[in-house]
Regions:
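Flexible hinge/capping segments at coil-to-helix
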Residues: 84-98, 102-124
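Secondary-structure junction motif
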Residues: 108-109, 122-144, 210-214, 228-233
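Beta-alpha-beta core module
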Residues: 84-91, 95-97, 158-207
């Protein structure tokens, strides 16, 4: 009888640990802004080390607490949805500018702004196919009526930065999602035509409504995003 009672007590402990672990685990799926999201998780866990993350990059979102994707910004200001789709309990839109990144010796480096039609003959360093930002930037080019001449494609912001700094081409650079300014050797120029902005859409699903930690992290991520600003000297304004 005693071994049976001990087994029951152990099972209760295991079930409690399982429930506690689930309540302290955030299931996060994202298709954009991987650098920003990774850095925000590291920063968040520095003060909340007991919170765990299960991270995925999938088109399907049924099993996640939070999903982050990007969309081209059409409206003047980020939308504020009054009605949410079924299964969604919260949605935030985080807007950022998309700049043109050029080497310091580029003829465009001293420009205060640039029209994409002016760079139609330039070589571009681009993100690889399949990335949402790549599709958004392709749409910017279509709106400007240009077809970028790609000399290199990479899925790494660091590679884009290094190749632009080396003078091999120009590229697009998001204001915040890649973790701020690119650093020495790259100049960022605001694009005046077409308007080049995107929204990061952060969605919290109904399955997470009883997990306060998910709502807390979503608040933290939104604040973290707003703090990511480009330093003067890195951008031509």
């Amino acid at each position: 009888l005693i071994p049976i009672l001990e087994s029951i007590d152990n099972l209760k402990d295991e079930l409690w640990e399982s429930v506690y672990s689930s309540e302290r685990t955030i299931y996060l799926n994202f298709l954009s802004a991987s650098n920003l999201i990774t850095n925000s998780i590291i920063s968040y866990r520095a003060s909340k080390p007991d919170i765990q993350f299960q991270v995925s990059q999938l088109e399907m979102t049924e099993s996640c607490d939070i999903h982050i994707e990007s969309r081209i910004a059409i409206s003047v200001t980020p939308p504020h949805p009054q009605e949410l789709p079924d299964g969604v309990v919260r949605r935030e839109y985080l807007r950022e500018e998309i700049f043109l990144a050029v080497p310091p010796d580029s003829k465009f480096a001293k420009h205060k702004t640039v029209d994409l039609r002016e760079v139609k003959e330039e070589n571009f360093i681009r993100l690889g196919n399949g990335w949402q930002l790549r599709g958004i930037c392709d749409d910017f080019c279509r709106r400007a009526g240009i077809r970028p001449q790609a000399v290199f494609e990479s899925n790494s912001p660091e590679s884009v930065r290094n190749l632009v700094a080396a003078g091999l081409g120009i590229g697009f650079w998001p204001e915040k999602a890649w973790g701020g300014p690119p650093g020495h050797g790259v100049v960022l120029i605001p694009i005046r035509y077409p308007i080049c902005r995107r929204d990061l859409v952060v969605t919290m699903f109904e399955q997470a409504k009883d997990k306060p930690v998910v709502d807390e992290f979503m608040d933290y991520f939104c604040r973290y995003f707003e703090k990511e600003t480009l330093e003067s000297g890195d951008v031509t304004l």
